[in-house]
């Protein structure tokens, strides 16, 4: 039964109302510093911890709750007579509810002007110590680190005579240990990232010790293949607009492959300003287009490769309206992603309950790192978020691209970034015409892209081509020109650049070098 609570919070969201409800239930309130003042100013009966322990706060508040009367009251096991006798002997009442959240360390170090001294002063000591004590003794103590749990605790207390059951206490305790682990991980990441701990001149993006924190969203039926087990975890710092923040409106449970392909589709479609549609199969775009609206963009994207689009993942960067929904509903689709769906669109898919509809808010945020597991280790890199600017483009051929060709080239370049290497992408009029992906030789990717367009009945005459990396020989260029391309965009940087540029001049096509490579493995 909860008779006494200790409350000490940095995030004061909802704390006055929560404390008032506790007081109304007859719970005695202990508190510290600013929290105690806030509660007292609200007219609540609260005892300062310094008055409770008989020992004042000291060292600029660094020592407030590190006292046997606090930790003894938290850690004592109520089922052990010797523990309770020790409390009685020393005049220590039990503390049955602990409400604590920590100094805002992560928010502090995120500030551009944060110094090492600022960071150090925002490393909480007393808070984590109390939290861990209470979480360890969760059989007897309820511990709350998240304001979102205030209502849960109150409801259970009201229903059970000021008692919170073991299942809730256990869940809250696990939440505490996860929270303190993440807190310590953030401190370690910060301190081991300092390149000059004395002057605090700068920080490395890659700390000597890397701690990552994820919460499980769900267990998955299986992994990439049925014999593999799997689960999906969300980054605790997932940015706005990230796939992990999806809201599923209908459909079957997402699979491992659904999630992986949906991420590829969403990351690609977000890069376009005009209404766009991206169709993904096995993490590769098989159709990308921009149009007047979602329906128009879909029609053009689907036209690229109708065969591969079967059972694909489709993403839009605009609301899916009834017209777009009716067009998509004619095909077999696994997942449909958009910032929103109109009511009429939802009605269209109501008859197709197996189709998974995901809503994700558009956002500019990106993950801090791109991670890839290798045997016994982890490769960590910054995201490939580089977008070339017009002044960075270099025309290296005698013929310059026309304005229309330039538009097609930039569109093709944007798509190629999301195609598995080696990547060759034919485009024209705001749509992909042929995509060659994942081949060991660039010339084979060029041939496949040409064949794909031919199979779809699309002409490549006058098309633009993007290559994610340089042409090592002129053979790949010869293939795309023979297919009908009149302009090419590529990074350059090959030992044979002069030979490839000479071939472009020989064919009287325009070639642009970006100086940026977009390998994707």
Curated annotation (Swiss-Prot):
> What GO terms describe the biological role, i.e. biological process, of this protein?
'de novo' IMP biosynthetic process
Gene3D superfamilies referenced in this protein's UniProt entry, alphabetically: 3.40.140.20, Methylglyoxal synthase-like domain
Q: What is its EC number?
A: 2.1.2.3, 3.5.4.10
Describe the location of the MGS-like domain by residue ranges.
Answer: 1-145
List the SMART domains hit by this protein, alphabetically: AICARFT_IMPCHas, MGS
Gene Ontology MF terms in the entry: IMP cyclohydrolase activity; phosphoribosylaminoimidazolecarboxamide formyltransferase activity
InterPro entries the record matches: AICAR_Tfase_dup_dom_sf, Cytidine_deaminase-like, MGS-like_dom, MGS-like_dom_sf, PurH-like
Cite the annotated pathway. Answer: Purine metabolism; IMP biosynthesis via de novo pathway; 5-formamido-1-(5-phospho-D-ribosyl)imidazole-4-carboxamide from 5-amino-1-(5-phospho-D-ribosyl)imidazole-4-carboxamide (10-formyl THF route): step 1/1; Purine metabolism; IMP biosynthesis via de novo pathway; IMP from 5-formamido-1-(5-phospho-D-ribosyl)imidazole-4-carboxamide: step 1/1
Task: State the superkingdom.
Answer: Bacteria
How is this protein annotated for GO cellular component? Answer: cytosol
List the catalytic activities from the record. (6R)-10-formyltetrahydrofolate + 5-amino-1-(5-phospho-beta-D-ribosyl)imidazole-4-carboxamide = 5-formamido-1-(5-phospho-D-ribosyl)imidazole-4-carboxamide + (6S)-5,6,7,8-tetrahydrofolate; IMP + H2O = 5-formamido-1-(5-phospho-D-ribosyl)imidazole-4-carboxamide
A Pfam family that the UniProt record links to this protein: MGS
What does the UniProt keyword field contain?
A: Hydrolase, Multifunctional enzyme, Purine biosynthesis, Transferase
**Per the similarity annotation, which family is this?**
Belongs to the PurH family.
Record remark on domains: The IMP cyclohydrolase activity resides in the N-terminal region.
Protein name in the entry? Bifunctional purine biosynthesis protein PurH
Species for this entry: Burkholderia cenocepacia (strain ATCC BAA-245 / DSM 16553 / LMG 16656 / NCTC 13227 / J2315 / CF5610) (Burkholderia cepacia (strain J2315))
């Amino acid at each position: 039964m909860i008779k006494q609570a200790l409350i000490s919070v940095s995030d004061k969201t909802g704390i006055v109302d929560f404390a008032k409800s506790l007081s109304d239930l007859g719970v005695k309130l202990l508190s510290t510093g600013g929290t105690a003042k806030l509660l007292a100013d609200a007219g609540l009966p609260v005892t300062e911890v310094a008055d409770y322990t008989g020992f004042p706060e000291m060292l600029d508040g660094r020592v407030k709750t590190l006292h046997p009367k606090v930790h003894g009251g938290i850690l004592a096991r109520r089922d052990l007579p010797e523990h309770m006798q020790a409390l009685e002997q020393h005049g220590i009442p039990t503390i049955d509810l602990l409400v604590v959240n920590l100094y805002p360390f992560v928010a502090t170090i995120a500030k551009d002007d944060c110094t090492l001294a600022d960071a150090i002063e925002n490393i909480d000591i007393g808070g984590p110590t109390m939290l861990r004590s209470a979480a360890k003794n969760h059989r007897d103590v309820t511990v709350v680190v998240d304001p979102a749990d205030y209502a849960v605790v109150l409801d259970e207390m009201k229903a059970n005579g000021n008692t919170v059951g073991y299942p809730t206490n256990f869940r809250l305790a696990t939440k505490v240990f996860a929270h303190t682990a993440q807190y310590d991980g953030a401190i370690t990441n910060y301190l081991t990232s300092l390149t000059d701990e004395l002057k605090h001149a700068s920080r490395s993006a890659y700390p000597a010790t890397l701690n990552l924190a994820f919460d499980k969203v769900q267990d998955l039926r299986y992994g990439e293949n049925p014999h593999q087990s799997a689960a999906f975890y969300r980054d605790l710092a997932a940015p706005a607009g990230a796939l992990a923040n999806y809201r599923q409106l209908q459909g079957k449970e997402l699979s491992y492959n659904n999630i992986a392909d949906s991420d590829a589709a969403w990351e690609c479609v977000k890069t376009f300003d005009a209404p766009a549609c991206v169709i993904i199969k096995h993490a590769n775009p098989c159709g990308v287009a921009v149009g007047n609206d979602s329906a128009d963009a879909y029609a053009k994207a689907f036209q690229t490769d109708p065969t591969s689009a079967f059972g694909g993942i489709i993403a839009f960067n605009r609301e899916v309206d009834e017209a777009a929904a009716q067009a998509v509903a004619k095909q077999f689709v696994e997942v449909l992603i958009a910032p929103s769906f109109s009511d009429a669109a939802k009605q269209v898919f109501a008859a197709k309950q197996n189709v998974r509809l995901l809503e994700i808010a558009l956002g500019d945020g990106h993950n801090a790192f791109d991670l890839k597991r290798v045997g016994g280790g982890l490769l960590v890199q910054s995201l490939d978020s580089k977008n070339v600017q017009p002044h960075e483009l270099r025309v290296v051929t005698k013929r310059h691209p026309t304005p229309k060709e330039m538009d097609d080239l930039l569109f093709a370049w944007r798509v190629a970034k999301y195609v598995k290497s080696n990547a060759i992408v034919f485009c024209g009029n705001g749509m992909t015409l042929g995509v060659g992906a994942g081949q060991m030789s660039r010339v084979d990717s060029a041939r496949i892209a040409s064949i794909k367009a031919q199979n779809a009945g699309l002409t490549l005459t006058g098309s633009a081509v993007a290559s994610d990396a340089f042409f090592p020989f002129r053979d790949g260029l010869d293939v795309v020109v023979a297919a009908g391309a009149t302009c090419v965009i590529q990074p350059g940087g090959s030992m044979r650049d002069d030979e490839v540029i000479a071939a472009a001049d020989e064919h009287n096509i325009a070639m642009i070098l970006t100086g940026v490579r977009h390998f994707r493995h």
